[in-house]
Amino acid sequence: MFQKLIVITFAIALASANIFDFLNNFNTGGRQQQNQGVRTPQEYESVVLNSQCDKYLCPDTGLCVEAPKFCPCPYPSSQIRCFLPDGRFVCISKPAGEGISEKYNDPKTNWKIDAKDDNIRDCGWVNRAWRGLV
């Protein structure tokens, strides 16, 4: 009886795995999906070298801007740009959570917000970390 139960369980597991594998192949056309945003180094180099930008070409986004400080983050819907005391900037993930994430949606003001809480990683936290206070 116990052996029959093991055999039946194994057969069900095997059938389930095959069904899910079939559905996965059916949805992707039998091939691996590729990230369309990733370029090869050669393609990236070609884009940079053939750019018609006469100012500053942002390395992360390929946008032509007046100066490096105007480069946007590569993923503006989920990142904020925090300026460092030396004039450079870093892009970090927007803080998330109930009642917190809405404050960081406006790119014109989100870099000014400091929650003054070391558990919330915003631009205020970045500046405190830069100064060694975290």
From Swiss-Prot:
<dbReference type="InterPro" id="IPR034543">
    <property type="entry name" value="LCL2"/>
</dbReference>
<protein>
    <recommendedName>
        <fullName>Long chronological lifespan protein 2</fullName>
    </recommendedName>
</protein>
<comment type="similarity">
    <text>Belongs to the LCL2 family.</text>
</comment>
<dbReference type="GO" id="GO:0036503">
    <property type="term" value="P:ERAD pathway"/>
</dbReference>
<keyword id="KW-0732">Signal</keyword>
<feature type="signal peptide">
    <location>
        <begin position="1"/>
        <end position="17"/>
    </location>
</feature>
<comment type="function">
    <text>Probable component of the endoplasmic reticulum-associated degradation (ERAD) pathway.</text>
</comment>
